[in-house]
């Protein structure tokens, strides 16, 4: 009896020349509580192990890693739908990566607070805006478009 044999798919070029891309996506997360400067928090898939994360950071991003600690965060189970059935968010894994000696990481300030504009320039701009309205239809507000 003959069996169906699956041969590996032919790809052009040697295996050393191919670029390996992982199926994992990791998220850098701002920690909720204060952590040491050499510790970084990630949200990783449930299938990813400590060794996978260490290799991911060291091989792809050239980040020296001293230790990796993981925990499973259970998803929230409080929401209910229109039939009063509980809706559970999926579980996810949280990884705490301790960087090698001398390495520090501070989370970037992505949204710096802007200084609120003083009201004086607004008062100066108001007459200019009134004059710049459409001169063909005086007395009609600009929001009332034709």
UniProtKB/Swiss-Prot annotation:
Cite the Pfam families for this sequence: Ribosomal_L23
Query: Which controlled-vocabulary keywords does the entry list?
Result: Mitochondrion, Ribonucleoprotein, Ribosomal protein
Q: Which residues form a coiled coil?
A: none
The compartments listed are: Mitochondrion
GO molecular function ontology, one term from the record: structural constituent of ribosome
The question of whether Phosphoprotein is a record keyword is answered with: no
Q: What is its main location?
A: mitochondrion
Give the Basic and acidic residues compositional bias ranges.
Answer: 111-120
Q: What is this protein called?
A: Large ribosomal subunit protein uL23m
Please tell me the species this chain comes from.
Mus musculus (Mouse)
């Amino acid at each position: 009896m003959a069996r169906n044999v699956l041969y590996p798919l032919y790809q052009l070029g040697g295996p050393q020349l191919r670029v390996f891309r992982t199926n994992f996506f990791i998220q850098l997360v701002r920690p909720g509580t204060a952590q040491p400067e050499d510790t970084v928090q990630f949200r990783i898939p449930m299938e990813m192990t400590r060794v996978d994360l260490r290799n991911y950071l060291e091989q792809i991003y050239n980040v020296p890693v001293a230790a990796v600690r993981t925990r499973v965060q259970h998803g929230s189970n409080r929401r209910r739908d229109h039939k009063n059935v509980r809706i559970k968010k999926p579980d996810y894994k949280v990884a705490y990566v301790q960087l090698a000696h001398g390495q520090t990481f501070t989370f970037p300030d992505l949204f710096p607070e802007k200084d609120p504009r003083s009201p004086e320039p607004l008062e100066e701009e108001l007459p200019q805006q009134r004059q710049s309205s459409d001169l063909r239809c005086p007395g009609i507000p600009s929001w009332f478009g034709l």
